[in-house]
C-alpha cells in the first residue's frame, strides 16, 4: 500500500516538475495526462484563471481536473434536436462540470503533492533539494456533505527550504437567506489557527454599466464598467465601503454598440477597414449601402450643386451650408458629445457620400471619373483643408492652376484614393473631439495621426484611436466623471496603445478617489462583496464572499424558474451565491 502511494507521489511530482520546467523555457504544450483520466495544466500569471472570482489573485498555479470526454460525432437524429435543448445544454455549463473530481480523489492528489515536497520523505526517489512548485488546485464535484468545490495546496518556504504547506478548502452554495456574522468568522479563524491578532479587509465590486442585446438578432457589444473598492478594517458584513477606501475603475469597451452615439462614426471606420483589407488581399467585401440612390447619382448631384455655386462665385458660402447639412447627417447622433464639424472640405464631403453608397469597384471608378472630369473642365473649384497628402488633394490643387496630372483609374488606384480621403476625414474627427474636449493635444495624438507610416499602419492606428474615443464616450455617458478623471483615462489609453496592438478585450484600470464616484455606489448593491480575515500571514486566511453570479464555473447550481418571480422582485434579487475559503497549516519541521 505505502509503496504504491510512494510511487504515485513520485510520478505525480515528476509530471508537475516537467510541466513547470518546460513552461519556464517558453515551451507551450497541452496539459499533461496523469493516470489516463486526469489532466494537469499550468496557468501562468496573466492567463485566464478559474480561481480569480474566489481568491482575487492571479499567480501561477497548477489546475487539476478530469480529462474531458471526447465529443462524439452527432447522429442525424441528434442534429435535429431543438434549438431550445441546445441552448439549455450550453447554459448549464455541463462540459465544465464533467471536469470535476470526487473529493476522495482530489484529497489523494493533494496528498501526493504534499508528500513530494515534504523534506522528511527522504525515501522518495526525488532529486534533493526538492524544487518548490507553484500552488496546486483540484476541481471538486461538490458531492460531499460540505459541498467542496476546490481543494488547494500552497507551499510555505524560506529562501532555501520548504518548511510547510497551507491546505485550502473552498465551498460554494446558493443562499437566498444567508446568515453570517463578522465576529463569528473572526472567532472561527482564531480558533482554527490559534492566533490572537487578526485583520479584516474588505472588497466590493459594483457594476456601473453593462451593455445588453437589442433583441435576439442583435448581439450586444461586450462593454462593461465596474468599480472595485478595497478597504480595511471591515466593521460588518456587507458594509458600504468608506470614503477612505482605495478605488479602481475597470473599463472594457467593445466598439460598435448599435445604439451608441458613435455608431455612424464606427460604420465609417468599418468601411475604411474594408478598403484597407481590399488593398491588402485583393478582395473587397462591400457593405450594404445606407442610401437609396446610387453612389454615382449622389456624387453627380453633389458636383452639379458645386458647379452652380461656382457659376455665381459663391462657392464658399454654399460649401459651408452643404457642409453643415452633411455634418448633421453624419454626426447628428453624436453632436451631444462631439462638436459637430461645420468645416468638412470637399474631399470629406465626398467621403461621406461615397462611404454610405459605394457597393462595387465600378462605382469607385465612375465616381472618381466624374470628379476628375469636373476638375479638368474647371466646373468646380473646391476648397480643401491644408496638410492633406492624398492623391485627390494634389489633383484639386493642380486644378487651381489649370494643369492636372493624368491619373489612370485602374488597379488599386481608386481604392487607394478613397482610403486616403477617409483617413484624412476620420483623423480630423478624432482631433476635433480630443482637442475640443481638452483631453489631448496634437503632440499627444501624433502617434495616431502621423502620415509618415504606410497606409495599412495608419489605418491600424486610427482604429486604436477610435477605440480610445469609444472608451472615453462610454464613460462620459454612463458614469459622467469629472474632467480630471476623463483626462487621466484618455492619457492612460494613449500610452497603452502607443505600445500595444488593438485589443478590445483589454480592461483599462484607472485609480479614482471614492469621493469622486460615491454617488455611483453608495446606494447600490454590490455585484460582489468579500471579507478576508488574516493574521499577518498572507497565506493563512479565511474568506467569505457574496456574489450575484456563481464564482465556481464547474458546478451547476439550481436557479429559480422565472415563474417563481413576483412583480415585486427580480431574478437578481432572488439569487445570491456565498462561498467560503478556509485553510489549515501543516509544518514539516
Swiss-Prot record:
Recorded GO CC terms: RZZ complex
Residue numbers bearing the Phosphoserine modification: 88
UniProt keyword annotations, A-Z: Cell cycle, Cell division, Centromere, Chromosome, Kinetochore, Mitosis, Phosphoprotein
Gene Ontology biological-process entries: cell division; mitotic spindle assembly checkpoint signaling; protein localization to kinetochore
Record flagged with keyword Cytoplasm: no
Coiled-coil zones: none
Subcellular localization, as worded in the UniProt entry: Chromosome, Centromere, Kinetochore
Pfam families the UniProt entry points to: Zwilch
Family, as annotated: Belongs to the ZWILCH family.
PANTHER family: PROTEIN ZWILCH HOMOLOG
Function of the protein: Essential component of the mitotic checkpoint, which prevents cells from prematurely exiting mitosis. Required for the assembly of the dynein-dynactin and MAD1-MAD2 complexes onto kinetochores. Its function related to the spindle assembly machinery is proposed to depend on its association in the mitotic RZZ complex.
Subunit structure: Component of the RZZ complex composed of KNTC1/ROD, ZW10 and ZWILCH; in the complex interacts directly with KNTC1/ROD.
Protein's recorded name: Protein zwilch homolog
Biological source species: Bos taurus
